[in-house]
From Swiss-Prot:
Record HAMAP family: MetA_acyltransf
Family: Belongs to the MetA family.
Native organism: Rhizobium rhizogenes (strain K84 / ATCC BAA-868) (Agrobacterium radiobacter)
Gene Ontology MF terms in the entry: homoserine O-acetyltransferase activity; homoserine O-succinyltransferase activity
Site (Important for substrate specificity): 192
Protein known as: Homoserine O-acetyltransferase
Keywords: Acyltransferase, Amino-acid biosynthesis, Cytoplasm, Methionine biosynthesis, Transferase
Amino acid sequence: MPIKIPDTLPAFEALQNEGVRVMTETMAIRQDIRPLQIGLLNLMPNKIKTEVQMARLVGASPLQVEFSLVRVGGHKAKNTSEEHLLSFYQTWEEVKHRKFDGFIITGAPIELLEYEDVTYWDEMKQILDWTTTNVHSTLNVCWGAMAAIYHFHGVPKYTLKEKAFGVYRHQNLKPSSVYLNGFSDDFAVPVSRWTEVRRADIEKVPNLEILMESSEMGVCLVHEQACNRLYMFNHVEYDSTSLADEYFRDVHAGVPIKMPHNYFPHNDPEIPPQNRWRSHAHLFFGNWINELYQTTPYDLEDIGEERL
């Protein structure tokens, strides 16, 4: 069954053109089932591109999903029109009374700031605490993952000497994990960040389990079983051209940037890159959504009750 999003959302047409099944409100009502409620807290500047990336992966599930777009209230977006935000987004204040089966918190290009210097950090802390009681499973991505693991466990981030940028081989450290069901032992994942968290700090925290890691780029995915929380520090959701877009943006702006590692064929930026992570991205999101379906309470109001 497909993902339910407004048919006027730009992602609707984009996903239809890719063959991803999407449905309107009218179609969803005909199916007499409870759809999974999944929210997306979109912190990225280009919100439309991120909507498409996440909806593509969530919408590939055979389960019916109602996808809600959420934004922080105390921050004015510079790269997305106010009309788009008013049409398709709700602030967290407007949805905090709700319960969600799943909730995704994206990255944001603010990783070089101290957390406490982020303009919406106070609201971010409230949102993270809220996910403990109002969300069955939270998927935190890149900066969102670093912020969450710092907020809940004090795990620090470290600034890198140069940007971690490219497509790197990663290892499956826990083949028996439900989130890695069907994964190869070794697979490619896009990386784009100026900071990192370190294994030594994570290992100090009980109940945090490292599921994916790169010998070059370090920790990629951490699972916290007690609250069904996932920390994904890299970008399995990226489009084929996402790293190229970032590279050419910086080149044209005169910002020093190395060519992304293991990305352009023959290291030639004139040759379109090949996507070598798409299948594992779909597998990861499919496993996450399947685990939601298997373990979430049927009654939404029961979500989080055991954590109170």
